[in-house]
């Protein structure tokens, strides 16, 4: 007997249960204090964190972040430094381009040119 399309759409047969539907596993008292590694070498505590999703960041997270508000003077100093570095990169790039061009177009070649008779 076949099910109608509506019944097939409502309940997928091979879908894993959601985390809310799963019963919580009882952890023995001795395992809580001393986590033992599983087959892959990952402790059960760390394995549980992966299953439960990502952990929340600590309270001091915002203070430790590298992104911070700068005063306008610091921003101007940083922009000046960036411009100076760009000019230096441009200068070095032009230097290498000229060296490459001179090597390719020089009349004195590092190897003799052989003409076939």
Swiss-Prot record:
Coiled-coil stretches: 73-100
Biased composition (Basic and acidic residues): 1-24, 61-74
InterPro entries listed in its UniProt record: TF_A-like/BEX
Annotated region described as Disordered, given as residue ranges: 1-74
GO cellular component, as recorded: nucleus
Main location, first listed in the record: nucleus
Source species, domain of life: Eukaryota
Subcellular location: Nucleus
Alphabetically ordered keywords of this record: Coiled coil, Nucleus, Transcription, Transcription regulation
Disulfide bridge positions per record: none
Function: May be involved in transcriptional regulation.
Family of the protein in this entry: Belongs to the TFS-II family. TFA subfamily.
Protein name (Swiss-Prot/TrEMBL): Transcription elongation factor A protein-like 8
Organism: Bos taurus (Bovine)
């Amino acid at each position: 007997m076949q099910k109608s399309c509506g019944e097939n759409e409502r309940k997928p047969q091979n879908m894993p249960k959601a985390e809310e539907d799963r019963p919580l596993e009882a952890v023995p008292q001795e395992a809580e204090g001393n986590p033992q590694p599983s087959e892959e070498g990952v402790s059960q505590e760390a394995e549980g964190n992966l299953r439960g999703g990502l952990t929340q960041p600590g309270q001091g997270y915002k203070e430790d972040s590298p992104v911070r508000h700068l005063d306008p003077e610091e921003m101007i100093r940083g922009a000046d430094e960036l411009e100076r570095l760009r000019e230096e990169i441009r200068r070095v790039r032009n230097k290498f381009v000229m060296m490459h061009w001179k090597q390719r177009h020089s009349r004195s070649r590092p190897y003799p040119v052989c003409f076939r008779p």
